[in-house]
């Protein structure tokens, strides 16, 4: 979650509001909602713009709304900025369950809602629920303009519902920001996306203005991409398998040789020594576990192995031409012929390939096996 009590109007707020149609400020009826007002940055800026456009206090009060689960936040923001809109205390989970069937919808739903919530030493992502509810609360043709994490841009996974939403609705603008931007803007070591979508069905040819993290802006048809990289779109898409091309075979399992399994141990035993790669050091030295079973896959398969240890630039790799290693859930492998594996390793360890993977990270700084699985089988030829 980004800063919830930051009271200056950030440049990012100004830019996001600037990207909305100018007519929403001159209109006397446009309705606004911030689903989690926090310190009031957005509603403050909205009220000020409406006031600058000549609207009365009564008019502004009738159409600027906000929710926040902390009454302290609401009182502080209202008193500090003399806010006149209608701001209601509501727990996030209650907001997510709002029955919007008979609710009057909003022309603009905008804000920077919290990323996650913490309960009983556990945390869960709540930003997807904010995105879904924001679209539900927007009028037909209305706008949803939110800041949230970048996980939805990854290959198919737990945020598919957000990816499907943004590619079926009209996503007009996407601004991708790296960890350095997160520290600078919010004082948080997290990457984030700024998304501005219109609540209309997108056409098959719709192109989104994507501002990549290297400040390059391109018009992109997101429907044609298996994932959305952070930068270097042209170079990344060169190695992605096209229709009809054979993709890379990636080997991975969350359960075959997990360290907690009864047949896996850190201690050598009288059983045949069957290796399970747990992690690799930056010098490509395997940290091994021992398994009393070899019937759960991986063994006997020639492959190039890497793991989650180290970041994208420092992670090691090893050639397992004989297929003597199994993989824990922390390790991954590219399957190929023993002849090709040394060349694949050369490509995999190259600076050029690692830079491609840097451009594909959606969260943690590890080499993303889901992304590699979208590459064409002979991708390595581009790097050797």
Regions found by a protein language model. Give the residues of each.
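C-terminal substrate-recognition regions of SAM-dependent nucleic acid methyltransferases
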Residues: 3, 104, 180-384
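Conserved class I S-adenosyl-L-methionine
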Residues: 28-38
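Conserved acidic residues
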Residues: 30, 107, 303
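Eukaryotic short linear interaction motifs
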Residues: 16, 72-74, 313-314
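Signature of N6-adenine DNA methyltransferases within the class I
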Residues: 6-12, 36-44, 50-51, 55-63, ...
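Flexible, charged surface loops at secondary-structure boundaries
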Residues: 25-27, 57-59, 101-104, 296-300
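S-adenosyl-L-methionine
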Residues: 1-28, 42
